[in-house]
Amino acid sequence: MSNPLRYNIGDVRLTYTGRHEAMELSKDKVSTFNLRHQEVLNFYGFELAGGTVFVIDDRVNGHSNLGVFRSKQLRQAVILAAALPAAAVVIDGFGALNKVPKDLQTKDLVNRLKRHNDRIAAQVMSEVLQITTETFDLGEEVIIESAITEGVRAKPGVEAGGNPTIAVGALFGKEEHCSRYSHGLTEEVNRLSMGSDVIDGTGKSVEGLHSSLTALFITESNFKRHLPDIYVERWMTAAPFPEFNPRDTDLKEEARIIADACGIKKFSEMTAYFLDRPRHHPAMDQLNGIGVATPFDKDGDLFPALVMGLDGLRFPDGRGLHSMIGEIGGSAEWTVGALPLVWRGGQSLGMLTSQSSLTRKDLSPEELWNERFHYTEEELILLQDARFEQKPFFTVNDLMENPFAGGVSAFCAISDNYFLPHLEGVKIDHEQGLITTNTLMINCLGNIEHWQLSFKCVEGFETTAKKIRSPKSELRNLEKAQIEKQVKDMVNNETDRFRLKHFFINEYYPAIIHTGSKMVVLEKTIESMIDRKAFSEHDRDIVKAVVRAAPEWFISAA
């Protein structure tokens, strides 16, 4: 029997009739943009051909200023660090599963394709940030440390974990600053923190489905705690609400707290978004029972946080996209979505759950829901190490020293976004050599803008496509001796060397220890990841070839 309060956002579509005020970039502004970002754009053979900035909300929250992000180069670089990876995925990887006959579409193939898309997104995002940080003059210099990331955790029966990503601890900045990051970095260099999900909806990106995107924020705030890459239950909306302990409340009480914050008198006017997972069915049933609608999607729970409560965003029944109440997803998605929501004036509460319990296949939906806080010993140690044992629920204030420090976030649509329909996926005009991207920008002031940028492939589309692919593509299907020769050639080419190093760090971070500006490769960890099929024997050959060809990058193997 159909439930009118539970609907797939792919079938029951949101519309947006709110503010979307266009400001076309003049020729002078386009020229200035190209000059400001010439090193990044030249690296891929791009130039900005034109663009429009659509203002969605220009009100300020009164809690912040831009800080170091008064630099247009820095804040626009965050937009580029979302837009260019999205373009790269569409050039090489989007919808790849659809090119394979159905009878050959195995779980292993899907995971390989997902890793491919994560790899290329992480590659380009890293390169944009590194190239940008190398161009700042004395007095404007920054160093960026990755503090929050997605893709690390194993998903039993689904993914082996260790997906290509921008790992926690990754640094972007001038070499002399990175080498002194933990000892002797001068105060003139601004330290920034970064959170990212290089692709939210990676599965959708390989299937060619809606609402996949790239996502990151960069902030002046330091992080007080590290949030482990495990599942987080979340309660959030676009209005402030008082903190509560989820151990002491039930779903109806939680719904009332959030409804009151939003000024909603009747539950029959309210929505709470969920991922379509068995673990969520009991919560959805309870909320439906009191009149709350529960729209859902098959993948991706980051973007709803960015637009919930937006004026003019409505489902066909007239309800807005209001909240999440008890939804459970990845910790990185929670953080990367929660900070911009707080900048907009909202609130987000999280609580670490037991991933081992929630991924069991032998439990009913009711048992999954009831077991969500039954931690294993290892999970409890993670929770204690992150210092959540006395307060297991948290907000961004518990993670960050100052959430309202200067900061910018950016989210570029890989495919058409069904939560904000104006955010269309990357469009490629092969004949004209034009690539158009659509990026949502939210800054620490609470401003919301939609940046539509069209890039010209100066040397032609095929040349740009080759420049933007992952270095691993050049090593595919090669024998060991061929890999060694190809890697040696890469190391001896300045551009290829730069790209190879970023690939190596993003790909093999689970088996790397950074010390100063050098690395230690953990050979036994490589072998253990091969055993659990996160890496392959091909990866072993690549690692050994890189260590031999670029010994100056490494201290020793362990």
Show where each model-derived region lies.
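Short, basic, low-complexity termini and linkers enriched in Ser/Thr/Gly/Pro
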Residues: 473-475
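Short helix/loop capping segments that flank catalytic or ligand/cofactor-binding pockets
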Residues: 204-206, 225-227, 282-283, 306
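An extended, acidic
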Residues: 7, 17, 251-445
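N-terminal subdomain of lithium-sensitive/metallo-dependent phosphomonoesterases centered on the IMPase/IPPase/PAP
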Residues: 1-194, 328-330, 469, 485-488, ...
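Conserved P-loop NTPase motor module
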Residues: 433-468, 558
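DPxDG-like acidic metal-binding loop motif
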Residues: 188-198, 204-224
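Hydrophobic "anchor" residues
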Residues: 203-204, 448
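Glycine-rich phosphate-binding loop plus the immediately following alpha-helix
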Residues: 215, 219-256
